[in-house]
Amino acid sequence: MPVKKKRKSPGVAAAVAEDGGLKKCKISSYCRSQPPARLISGEEHFSSKKCLAWFYEYAGPDEVVGPEGMEKFCEDIGVEPENIIMLVLAWKLEAESMGFFTKEEWLKGMTSLQCDCTEKLQNKFDFLRSQLNDISSFKNIYRYAFDFARDKDQRSLDIDTAKSMLALLLGRTWPLFSVFYQYLEQSKYRVMNKDQWYNVLEFSRTVHADLSNYDEDGAWPVLLDEFVEWQKVRQTS
């Protein structure tokens, strides 16, 4: 989860590198190297008091974990801010804004996860990753990401933020992602609205990589109609 300092587009969730003239996205690994989490005894029950004290290790005077606290939190748990596991955690906490956890979000979410310390959260990493492999949970995470990443005074995602979040969520699994990314790079679109965002996931799940089953008369957004047309021209040229 990129740390936002001024509510602009997020830090690059997937770095983009030049390769043979074509831009390809590199997705961060799920977890950087870290010491193994300490095994937690079943007798060590969840403590709301301990969870609150843990929150204050990172919160500022406004009782919010902001950019600086978030960086320290990520360092302590051994996860890069851009790592997709941070997006899953934010979803579990029902966090409203990227790069920020309120006290209410922290206590409600960590109570749900039964985590009141770093080690317990690290022991939940496999569970958090597993949510990405569940079709229903992934859909919920994907939809959550739209409102989570957008500036709250805007109805749509700016296109750079959309590309970064799509890279994080679909870059590893959608065969057409790199092509779609190239399309967005050269397109006229400067924002992506919620309907377009939702339909990109549906498109990635239902349309074949060769576009052979794409229904031109279907209720797809114009953005995707234009993408298909653009790609077919490239394939025949």
UniProtKB/Swiss-Prot annotation:
Residues the record lists as Phosphoserine modifications: 9, 41, 48
Tissue: Weakly expressed in testis, skin and immune tissues (thymus, spleen and lymph nodes).
Keywords, ordered alphabetically: Cytoplasm, Cytoskeleton, Nucleus, Phosphoprotein
A biological process term (GO) from this entry: positive regulation of protein neddylation
Compartment(s): Nucleus; Cytoplasm, Cytoskeleton, Spindle
One Gene Ontology molecular-function label: cullin family protein binding
Domain (DCUN1) ranges: 46-232
Known role: Contributes to the neddylation of all cullins by transferring NEDD8 from N-terminally acetylated NEDD8-conjugating E2s enzyme to different cullin C-terminal domain-RBX complexes which is necessary for the activation of cullin-RING E3 ubiquitin ligases (CRLs). May play a role in DNA damage response and may participate in cell proliferation and anchorage-independent cell growth.
Protein name, entry field: DCN1-like protein 5
Organism: Homo sapiens (Human)
Name of the gene this protein is made from: DCUN1D5
